[in-house]
């Protein structure tokens, strides 16, 4: 069964999306490369430079970038975690996710039909003391730069609240809340979040381990919100995909996550039905990214 469905995934997903299309000449070269070599196989998201927010022509320039990117073939806007966390203005002040100077950009994305894939903050554990009660203590030991000192950076909850504020203020814009908004450990909260913001989708990149340790609750979540979830992954490493397939598609029990620095628990399969897997793997993406060539995918 696993082998059949893994093949099923690859044949139904002939598209890869590059979230780092950048902008300007770099985006132009990326789009040119795609059009000349594999015009139907890649989607490119544009990126903006928030740290130019104080420039007199910041808004005009970025609205132009979005319009031209859309015309040239880009399919969305990707917002990296630096916004709200490390990006600063010309005076060194942190730029909040919901900085009102950015409001016209979110609105423009809605008008253009440009989904906004937004990654805000980090796992909440990165703000917590590095002790035996922190599930990601080993990761923070091995990668100390991931620790977020509450005395030096805004709290996890404050950054997340800023993100949710732009969802609220822009109901006409489709947002994809990356990494399940770091709420995969609390699916009741995640469900309430999706109920509150009907313009928000989410994706499962980097949170598989949280889903795999609560298979019954996670399966119920996928059943309830099957039209709101996308398949996502931070990096393209083929060997890691099989753990995703195993969690999503099988009823296997008590197996390891693919990394050793965190997720020190066993994983369990959700055994999702084909009807949900198809939505997760491609149907939901086709709905919110209509420029993707739907003829590459089965109709059923």
Feature roles, as predicted:
Residues 4, 38, 72, 111-112, ...:
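Helix C-cap/helix->beta junction micro-motif
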Residues 23-24, 55-59, 95-99, 155-159, ...:
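A conditional alpha-helix N-cap/helix-loop micro-motif detector
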Residues 8-11, 42-47, 77-79, 116-118, ...:
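Hydrophobic faces of well-ordered beta-strands that scaffold small-molecule active sites
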Residues 26-147:
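Active-site gating/metal-coordination segments in enzymes
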Residues 2-9, 71, 110, 282-286, ...:
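Sec-exported extracytoplasmic/periplasmic mature domains
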Residues 1-40, 60, 284:
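An N-terminally biased module of ancient metal coordination in phosphate/nucleic-acid-related enzymes
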Residues 151, 157-300:
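H/E-rich (His + Asp/Glu) clusters that bind or coordinate divalent metals
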Residues 17-18, 51-53, 84-86, 122-127, ...:
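Active-site environment of divalent metal-dependent phosphoester hydrolases
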């Amino acid at each position: 069964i696993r082998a059949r469905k893994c093949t099923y995934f690859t044949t139904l997903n002939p598209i890869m999306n590059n979230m780092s299309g950048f902008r300007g000449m770099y985006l132009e070269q990326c789009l040119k490369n795609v059009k000349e070599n594999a015009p139907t196989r890649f989607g490119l998201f544009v990126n903006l430079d928030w740290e130019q927010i104080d420039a007199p022509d910041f808004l005009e320039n970025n609205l132009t970038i979005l319009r031209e990117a859309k015309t040239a073939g880009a399919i969305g806007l990707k917002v990296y975690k630096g916004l709200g966390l490390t990006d600063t203005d010309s005076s060194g002040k942190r730029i909040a996710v919901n900085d009102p100077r950015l409001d016209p950009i979110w609105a423009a994305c809605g008008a253009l039909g440009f989904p906004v894939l937004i990654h805000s903050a980090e796992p909440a554990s990165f703000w917590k003391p590095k002790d035996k009660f922190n599930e990601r203590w080993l990761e923070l030991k091995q990668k100390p730069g991931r620790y977020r000192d509450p005395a030096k950076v805004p709290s996890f909850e404050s950054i997340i609240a800023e993100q949710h504020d732009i969802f609220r203020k822009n109901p006409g814009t489709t947002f994809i809340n990356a990494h399940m908004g770091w709420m995969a450990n609390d699916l009741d909260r995640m469900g309430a979040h999706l109920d509150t913001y009907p313009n928000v989708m989410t994706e499962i990149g980097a949170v598989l381990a949280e889903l795999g340790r609560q298979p019954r609750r996670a399966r119920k979540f996928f059943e309830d919100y099957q039209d709101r979830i996308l398949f996502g992954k931070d990096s393209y490493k083929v060997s890691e995909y099989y753990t995703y397939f195993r969690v999503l598609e099988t009823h296997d029990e008590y197996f390891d996550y693919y990394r050793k620095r965190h997720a020190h628990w066993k994983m369990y399969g959700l055994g999702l039905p084909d009807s949900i897997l198809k939505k997760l793997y491609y149907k939901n993406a086709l709905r919110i990214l209509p420029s993707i060539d739907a003829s590459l995918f089965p109709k059923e």
